[in-house]
Amino acid sequence: VRISYRVIAAVLAVLMSVMLAPAANACSRVTWLGPDGAVITGRSMDWPYSFHSHLYAYPRGLEQNGAGGINSLTWTTKFGAIVVAGTTDPEGPIDGIFDGMNEAGLVANLLYLGESDFGPAPADDRPRLSFAAWVQYVLTSFKTVDEVVEAFTDPAIYVVPINFGPGGAAKPTVHLSVTDASGDSAIIEYLDGKPVIHHGRQYQVMTNSPTYDEQLKLNAKWDNVDKNTDLPGSIQSADRFVRASYYLNNLPQTTDQRQAVAGVFSVMRNVSVPWGVGDPEHPNLSPTYWRSVADSTTKIYYFESALSPNIVWVNLNNINFAPGSGVRAVAVEENYSIIGNIDTELKPAAPVRFLAPPPNPPAPAAPGPGTSESDATGTTEQSKKGFGWWWIPVGLAVVAVVGALVRPLSRRPVEAATLAATRAPIAQVPPATPVAPEPTISDRQTSAADASSIQVTYENNALGEGEQDGTDKSDSVPD
């Protein structure tokens, strides 16, 4: 009986862990430091669904709003940038920026981190910035990693976590990597509401969970392994970290720019998740939709869609980032007709309207006599966490499994009594009398299968709609 109850507890623990697992991306990022100061950063974007990604060109001198709700951060762009923007909901508009490089060679990459915790909204009036605008703020405001680290060491800006995706089921648990043209890097994570920053040229690899300090410990045992060592090959974050570190360290120190870019792309493909492959029990492990490589030395930004055999790129040296030049964009994730240099494919577009928290949420009703606060507001602590619709079938599975395991235990009183009798002293055992055998209880199996297919349609965000929202502030690139 004890063993059975332990089995029940184990099953419940596993199922609850699945219920609490967030659907999120499992991306990877590396930075190659070559001879003569060459710096090239690559990343992969792994996700359960397409972001319908576009490349956007943002000019200098453009007024921006960080979509943070109350006390939302506003700023004027100091640097032009090429960024990857997409939809946080497959049926919604383009409302987030996840990756990119500015004209100074600063690169920013937003990746998933399950342990991320931005903390509760502050009671003071500090500026607030939507997590969907975090990359944009960094790339259009700073030139070096030192400047970024200084800006986020003192939490003068609150990064607002906003649930997104279908039904708002996805949690914005992310961390940020930044790399500049000198090769300096930083990993910025928010844990327990406070920024934790790893700053230095040595931080060349980043994946996902666990937290970065734990990733470094896990990777340490693989340092200095020879080329005959069998590397871990799963799609788990820790395994991707090991492979990325190993192959990055074994890339040739070439001065050939083509070979250098090819080397970084090859590492990113090695840690990518094949198309259509994932872990159904862990929705945070999803196929790779696209890869990017940003050359901070030549200022060329490359993009590769998993569904296209063509690599495209933008040379930032050829883009007009002058104030008043306007925002331009081109679809890249699902645009199969483009190839090679696409500088001229960038067409006028409206600026991205970033994902923002719901405006003016209704105040909860005061609880009456005999009414709890959760009854008055219509919420519970569990519903506040926003598990999403998918926990319902999992919850039913929990009930079914527990019922199947407990039912046989409750139907065995005769066996229990017989066992107790056999353990009693021999002198106390009465003469045996014939006992009719108890009817055998046949095993029962219950199974349930539920399959559904959701056809998601997507309407591309109209490019070129709306007027340019910006004012001229400067005619030159600041130092």
Write out the residue ranges for each language-model feature.
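Extracellular Ser/Thr-rich, low-complexity/disordered mucin-like segments
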Residues: P369-I392
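Cytoplasmic C-terminal tails of single-pass
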Residues: R411-D479
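A contiguous strand-loop segment
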Residues: A26-R126, V159
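Selective detector of the "anchor" transmembrane alpha-helix that sits immediately C-terminal
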Residues: F387-P408
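Bacterial N-terminal signal peptides
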Residues: A9-M19
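Bacterial N-terminal signal peptides that target proteins for export
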Residues: V1-A9
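Compact, glycine/acidic-enriched structural inserts
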Residues: G61-T76, E115-Y158, V327-Y336
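C-terminus-biased signal that marks the final domain/tail of proteins
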Residues: A26-I40, P48, H54, Q64, ...
